[in-house]
Amino acid sequence: MTQVCFVGDPEINLRYELLSRETARDALQTYDLGTPFHNSIGVETVSLGAAVALTNDLNWYIVRFVADVLVYDPSVSESEWLSRDLATAIRDDDVAHEESGRFLKIYGLEGDHGGTGGDGGSSPEADREIASEGEEVEESPITTGPSGGSEEGSAIDSGPRIGAEEPPRLVEPMYVTRTGPTVPEYDLRDVENTLVVRVTEDEFGA
């Protein structure tokens, strides 16, 4: 299974913005929604191609409400995430799996107590309430993504929990180049943990 995580802009409530809009809600309704990080929505899809297709279907909303899109595919790396652009390049065979790990963006994780996320206390009932109360807005037409879903016990929804605490917050990314087998140390601030995201060369140089 391939995981996709949409991280919201700091000034908005991402779950509300997406679930209060009919087209985005329809695109996400076949998935079990998790909250692996603060102000994020995480889903599991059947493949890397399905994950990229979902991000394309939600592009109108990504541009307006999302600060970052992260993709996790264990066939590429069991410990590192991919940027949306790199996931697309790998799907299109423009970048080989084994050549994808040179350019990195490392996030600090604040409030992480040993896991990489949890569900943040959300529930299907709360999501339905958001959907019913949300004001429908006029939006550009997009198609819904492929059918997907999470098996019971999936990593993104029933992995390490934070209990009553907030999911960890992604902070202050640091861009580094990997020149050996280890990842350079994150040194922008003191954090409990880090999240490594592989990016494209163009993203690294931007």
Where are these regions (language model features)?
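Short, structured protein-protein interaction patches enriched in aromatics and acidic/basic residues
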Residues: 70-108
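A glycine-rich, hydrophobic loop/mini-helix early in the fold
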Residues: 32
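Short, surface-exposed beta-strand/loop "edge" segments at domain boundaries and coil↔beta transitions
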Residues: 11-22, 48-53, 114, 204-206
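Hydrophobic alpha-helical segments
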Residues: 1-11, 55-61, 206
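Short, extreme N-terminal segment that most often corresponds to the first beta-strand
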Residues: 1-28, 38
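Short, conserved acidic/polar surface loops in the N-terminal third of protein domains
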Residues: 54, 82-85, 116-119
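Short, well-structured hydrophobic secondary-structure segments
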Residues: 36-76
